């Protein structure tokens, strides 16, 4: 084949200012915010009908991110989805500067104020993005203004109440707003109740735009109990947050028992536990069920052995294309699977894990193998290998998926380091490479040399290649 390419040389300059307004309050200002040195996202295989949640990796948004945290409970925000449940997050900073197609959008700049004022924890953020155009000149993403306001008040030692407001606005007819209230009631050292409620406003949606959750947690050294109820309206649309599934009501529960064996030479403790999630639509029809029974055994020297059994129920209302040419028809599906897992102590110079899952899957069967291995030959060099292989056999068609990554980190000196990540995703037919060289020439001042490449394994070949150089200099005043 003949590869036609176009070279683009782009330069820009930006800056950040950090000002300690008070001992507990910090103001950050940024102009032409740049994230070229940020590590690439970890590739994932998606065998569900729902969008995947990717964590924030950009330092500017990770710094003081806790001041924008909303909700408190864990079953309805962040984390992994169980049995078709919904992940809900009031504010997710990845919505700023990254569009729905995972494309970088230029950021003109903005400001952030975070910290403590008495019993108040506050976080405010204002950012302005530019527009993004395609190669043909059409607008892919419009310029947007983003505003986030978060305040939380401590009530005693264990309780708090707070409010969250977000606003994304491109024009008078293109906007999204969200208002939320949350609270935590710490009844005692063992018992907490978390609750939140949110409402969104979008010009093209009207009514049924609320979401809320209440969660109960009780824990002791040997027992942990959790119960949660989640309600998400059909038109709930947090464009500056994240929601996996709307129009549902879900009950989520779990029970953990953790017996310890101080006299055993081999077993430190066990952690048998059960989880159950029950999801219905707004009319009361059952959408999904998920039951998880697990037996974890933690060994004296840091290793872990686990055996689990999962049962799933899914109501599929629309055809679901799970792979190219493989479409699962609407209907009710039930299946079970068994999972075996071994993890070695991560503190060793050589560590790893092995995970094997086999059983039913929608209308057929699935087997999955996941292997991870790490090697640290010295204090300055480390390698991490991850492999994931799925074999899926359905009446509608059979297919396989593969996901692989190799990470290598090398610290030449305390001032110079290199971080490399190579990934392969068969679902996207992509091979990706991200190599970052960093040199700290004075404390707080850095030089970065970054190489990124994306290739289609079968087909057109090279998709994108970029070599980036970035210099930062810290001025103290």
Model-derived segments and their meaning:
Residues 106, 196-477:
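Exposed, low-structure sequence patches enriched in small/polar residues
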Residues 1-264, 309-314, 465-469:
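Outer-membrane beta-barrel channel domains
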